[in-house]
Amino acid sequence: MLFQLFDHPWPPFPFVSVMILRYSLYAVKGELDMSVSPGRTIRVGLALVLVGSTLSVAAQTATARIVTAANTFLSKLDEKQRQSVLFAFDDEKQRARWSNLPVSMVARAGLGLKDLNADQRAAAMALVSSALSPRGFEKVEQIVEGDELLKTKGGNNPMFGKDLYFISILGKPSERLPWMVQFGGHHLALNITIAGERGVLTPTLTGAQPALYTLDGKTVRPLGQESDKALALLNALDEGQRKQAVLGFQTADLVLGPGQDGKTIQPEGLKATAMNDKQRAMLLDLISEWANIIHESAAGARMAELKADVRETWFAWSGPTTADPGKNITAYYRVQGPHLVIEYAPQKLGGDLSMHVHTMYRDPTNDYGRGLTVK
């Protein structure tokens, strides 16, 4: 039926590919010319449909990749290990069993990396990597490496180190039905829900201590962009906007951190309706530091949702409005919208607020993928 809409036969595949590429580029630019012939107008519309289908195929491919990685990991475990790593998808106790604290202070369930052999451990990290973007996985690695530094520079303190991270799977890995991957330990809690072609990364906690270190001769700031982009946005505000954004009181820690599932908070600060286009673009760029941790297909869908919400999004700041060059800010900030809460909270433990930070990323309407329905 669709092909018969044209006033001539559907062209062979190579021409279709060229046509889709040509007209999808015009569509992305918003340069549709409605004065063209009816056949070509229909082609543009069809190109948009097919471009959307291409994005859907990419998401399906990502899901298949994650499922394959999960099944590969499970195949390398013995029966006792599989019993330890697998939970029911609706296990609320396991969903909420995450924290910013070391595992010696808040126990995790699942399988610890220390209990895996080299092959199993590589498969576990391949599963985590498959669900994340390259930059997202790099952040995870940098957070874990920072914890290893806490161990080695603290006299091999058994509270810290890259062995003390846990992985669990909630539900059965599926390309259609919902299931979850959890990975975390000190300063890290990833809750990744996969439901068909959709992916959800909330709630997720990322933190860093040290927030600045040297590894193999390179300077590493695991959450440096989260600091720098926020300060750049603050500095882009005019005096009146800053007065609204900067709160008149001190916020010292995460408000909606671990143990706060299902709760919310009144938006504060500067609403993005009072920002200009450039400032709103900077706000979205800041948000992307969290939204883009997950794999690209899911991140693209998430950013589209957050862009649609941007005018209803708030930016609030509490604390010093400057930072030393190359170091993180020592102020708390929050970004909040209809489907979003981001918090950035420097920590006093360690003495230098720029060297210890906790961040939180939530979707109050869809944490743990609760808002997803399977088609």
Segments (PLM) and residue ranges:
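Bacterial N-terminal signal peptides
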Residues: 45-54
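Short, Lys/Arg-enriched N-terminal segments with co-localized hydrophobic residues
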Residues: 15-18, 22-33
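Sec/Tat signal peptide C-region and signal peptidase I cleavage site
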Residues: 55-59
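Bacterial N-terminal signal peptides that target proteins for export
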Residues: 35-45
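A cross-kingdom marker for long, charged
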Residues: 60-375
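Cationic, low-complexity basic patches in intrinsically disordered or flexible, solvent-exposed regions
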Residues: 5
